[in-house]
Amino acid sequence: MSTTDSIVSSQAKQSSWRKSDTTWTLGLFGTAIGAGVLFFPIRAGFGGLIPILLMLVLAYPIAFYCHRALARLCLSGSNPSGNITETVEEHFGKTGGVVITFLYFFAICPLLWIYGVTITNTFMTFWENQLQMPALNRGFVALFLLLLMAFVIWFGKDLMVKVMSYLVWPFIASLVLISLSLIPYWNSAVIDQVDLSNIELTGHDGILVTVWLGISIMVFSFNFSPIVSSFVVSKREEHEKEFGREFTERKCSQIISRASMLMVAVVMFFAFSCLFTLSPQNMADAKAQNIPVLSYLANHFASLSGTKSTFATVLEYGASIIALVAIFKSFFGHYLGTLEGLNGLVLKFGYKGDKTKVSMGKLNTISMIFIMGSTWVVAYANPNILDLIEAMGAPIIASLLCLLPMYAIRKAPSLAKYRGRLDNVFVTLIGLLTILNIVYKLF
């Protein structure tokens, strides 16, 4: 065999799919599938069949192109082991590092508030509807749940990290199983409501506005941006030295594409199954009640008259328990990120980044009190969760996931080769539409 043939054979072997590629595909997929998915069917099904079909068309491009853009930004740094903060500082200086620190903190903290509201509402509806117990004081319930989680986090963080990682796959399996099990309960209500002769495109309940608002919940639900930096560093260390950055970029894009396909398939099937089981009016009721779709399904099956099937009985109780586990998993993961982000801000601005000037134990305690206290205030106030996602959570995620990479592509020389592409226009448009939701919510 010639030298050229050997090189080609070696490259073909190395470029083949590895076990680590499968691990990262599932890791990206698992990061995105959390409590946010439980609200996607409500927003997606709120406007009926046509908007959710349009969202189905948009789902994969949003998931793939936006995360690929962020991955390309992470790949553009000169240090293969450098994370996104180091890369942004390399391109834009210390100011860029400060901006990314702020963005990370404010992208995660509102999500924690959202989960604080969600876990309170989910527990209360389970307590009152499934257990048939008298209503409890909302402030007490929120405080009890947050203190319980704070206790677990404080005394068993390492154990909980392992437990939560194991819960990802049972939760995903539960979503798929529920989606399949709902098929016998599908009905034609959502199809019957379609009137092609009287389609409203604009207006508050028009198709375009519904899809526009749906983009925000897709950005929120299809989001694995917190793990992209670690993913890219891992792949650069695995491939870049031997095969170069271009090969590494193609490998990262391939993994992100497959993870996005898996994510869209599971989430959209779950959303369609919920919509065909319920109706657009049921989705509107779920939004008004401010509860995730699994809690609404539990209440829906609890209200069925006559003899119930075994599945209906199991779902009546199991759906809320699955929702609580999913929310706790998401809350725990986002709490760690929020704590890290808040500590980073305090160290950067209060101690100029010098960890020796402060006790980390004391800093963790103060940060925990602030985080849990602010979460309790929001949980007690009980703002509408979808409105909170659309007005706060999704726009900040879009700033980090969509607009920051697009700005870097325009300004950073190492990203110049990606300029002038149509997918850049798409990612920028998704980011701007998501952020403009803030204006829509105000007016």
Curated annotation (Swiss-Prot):
Reactions this protein catalyses: L-threonine(in) + H(+)(in) = L-threonine(out) + H(+)(out); L-serine(in) + H(+)(in) = L-serine(out) + H(+)(out)
GO CC terms of this entry: plasma membrane
Signal peptide coordinates: none
Listed Gene3D superfamilies: Amino acid/polyamine transporter I (1.20.1740.10)
Subcellular locations according to the entry: Cell inner membrane
Pfam families: Trp_Tyr_perm
Primary site of residence: membrane
Keyword set includes Metal-binding: no
Its biological purpose: Involved in the import of threonine and serine into the cell, with the concomitant import of a proton (symport system).
The protein's name: Threonine/serine transporter TdcC
Gene that produces this protein: tdcC
